[in-house]
UniProtKB/Swiss-Prot annotation:
Keyword DNA damage attributed: no
Gene3D superfamilies registered for this protein in UniProt: Photosystem II cytochrome b559, alpha subunit
Family: Belongs to the PsbE/PsbF family.
Transmembrane segments: 22-36
Cofactor names: heme b
GO molecular function, one term: iron ion binding
Record protein name field: Cytochrome b559 subunit alpha
Quaternary state and interactors: Heterodimer of an alpha subunit and a beta subunit. PSII is composed of 1 copy each of membrane proteins PsbA, PsbB, PsbC, PsbD, PsbE, PsbF, PsbH, PsbI, PsbJ, PsbK, PsbL, PsbM, PsbT, PsbX, PsbY, PsbZ, Psb30/Ycf12, peripheral proteins PsbO, CyanoQ (PsbQ), PsbU, PsbV and a large number of cofactors. It forms dimeric complexes.
Domain of life of the source: Bacteria
Pfam families: Cytochrom_B559, Cytochrom_B559a
NCBIfam families to which the protein is assigned, alphabetical: cyt_b559_alpha
Length: 82
């Protein structure tokens, strides 16, 4: 071991090992697939409470609603949606 070494394996040794690629060949595509399904099924909208793209405006509105009172914004928008 070289002087000043922390005892960790060198990065090059890790990424050239078979064990690394056996583990990551499964986990990396799985993470990507899980993220893709989370977004494409719409579960992300439900989990974070954001409106879906077709729910931002009512069909009769052609532009975004303008809030005139800073601290009463939520109640103004609630009135518009009723």
């Amino acid at each position: 071991m070289a002087a000043g070494s922390t005892g960790e394996r060198p990065f090059f040794e890790i990424i050239t090992s078979i064990r690394y690629w056996v583990i990551h060949a499964i986990t990396l595509p799985s993470i990507f697939l899980a993220g893709f399904l989370f977004v494409s099924t719409g579960l992300a909208y439900d989990a974070f409470g954001t409106p879906r793209p077709d729910a931002y405006f009512q069909a009769s509105e052609s532009k975004a609603p303008v809030v005139s009172q800073r601290y009463e914004g939520k109640s103004e928008l609630d009135l518009r949606l009723k």
